[in-house]
């Protein structure tokens, strides 16, 4: 299964996961979110994203999605 990492502003990613869980009647496997706040040091997120990718990687890759192209989470 391909892992999915949602990198978003605020809690948008977790809200999307919660919506999917409501529709599917179960929490999706291999899906995680990371909330990015623009007032934080963005360099710290490099390590966190690497760790999340490693935990999601099961041999088929990881799809990384952001909420707004070109915005802070996308950079």
PLM features per residue range, with description:
Residues 2-75:
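N-terminal loops that bind phosphate or other acidic moieties
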């Amino acid at each position: 299964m391909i892992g999915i990492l949602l990198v978003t502003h605020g809690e948008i990613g977790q809200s999307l996961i919660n919506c999917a869980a409501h529709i599917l009647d179960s929490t999706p496997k291999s899906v995680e979110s990371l909330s990015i706040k623009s007032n934080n040091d963005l360099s710290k997120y490099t390590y966190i994203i690497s760790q999340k990718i490693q935990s999601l990687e099961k041999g088929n890759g990881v799809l990384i999605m952001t909420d707004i192209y070109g915005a802070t989470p996308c950079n």
